[in-house]
Amino acid sequence: MTRYCAATRCKNRGGQAAVIQRKVSFYPFPLHDRGRLQEWLRNMKQYKLYPTKHQVLCSDHFTADSFNIRWGIQYLKPNAIPTLFSFTEKIQDIAELELTIKEGTQDGVKVDTDTVPSQDFCPNVTNNLSHGFDTDEYVDPDDKQVYLKNTIDGITVSQNKTKDLYVPNSEYEIQPHLITPSKFRQTSVENMIVSSVADLNSQSNQVYFELQTDQNYVAENVDTFQVDHFSDVQKETFPLSLVKQTKQMDAEKDSVITIIVPGGQDGSAISDNLQFTSSEKLGFENDANSTNEILESEHSYCRQITDRHYLRQKIAKLQSKIAVLEAQENATLSRLRLLESVIAKLKQENLLSDEKLKILENCGSSVDIVIV
């Protein structure tokens, strides 16, 4: 694995041709010596760094008296401490940062010098953000206007002056208007979109439900609206829950609910085309039964294709084999019993022969005594 120097602003790494020519070597941190490790980190100005056994420092950060050369190999002394570190680039970065802060103040943007800017300033663009509705229609003129102001830490609220909100890396500007939730009512559900429709002549205690299709808009003056079923683009049928108006809404001019129905069909054709017939129900039941049969045939040990007569013959053969094995087992058991009886008889005969030998020896000794 390639070794990299853990010091900041140091670009030495193992395997470089320049490193090989200069004979730069790498040494691990003294993890076993805590005091020496703290001195290393203090000289590196890395107080929060806790190195691992894989992190190393190159020989450029040590003085010449920190090494012992034996047999042409450069060894680091056990008490060596790195002292050669360069922090000039960091000072240059700070100078560049101060220069950018001064340039920002010259352009008319005030920047706090104590904090580091993390956003890029963009020019003032007069394009409005569009969210699918006009904000002026939903702003209450009686409410107090709240304005947004851009700072370096975030967005602050101001009630005295009007400031432009600068969005980093964007082409839009948010105008100083605030949408109040008291006048804006919008209902959004899956497959249902609520939008605003301008120039409506509504009466009191009436609600306009607009059925929006891909081609036209149909507005109806009704108290309740019911949708039984609807179909999607692929002509697949599935039920939809009933949408009912259970209570009368406030008599306001902007209370409009728009429902988008896919497929480009009228409201009357929605419920007529989507009634399940008995044949369709039977078709669904047959499909379910066929799937169950397929699962049974796949996961059963006996396939449905085989015949019962063949299975009975196979069972009879297995039973005959079992009977033969039982007979062989009985025969082997009888043979074992016979062998046990023979062994017992031989043991008895052996005992008898031993007794006969002893008797003969006694007789022979008695005859010898008589002869003497």
Curated annotation (Swiss-Prot):
One MF annotation (Gene Ontology) recorded for this entry = DNA binding
Q: Which UniProt keywords apply?
A: Coiled coil, DNA-binding, Metal-binding, Nucleus, Zinc, Zinc-finger
The main location class comes to: nucleus
Q: State the InterPro entries in the record.
A: THAP_domain_protein (IPR052224), THAP_Znf (IPR006612)
Which GO cellular component does the record give, naming just one? nucleus
The signal peptide annotation in the UniProt record is none
Give the coiled coil ranges: 306-362
Localisation: Nucleus
Q: Where are the zinc fingers (THAP-type)?
A: 1-85
Q: What is this protein called?
A: THAP domain-containing protein 5
Organism ancestry: Eukaryota, Metazoa, Chordata, Craniata, Vertebrata
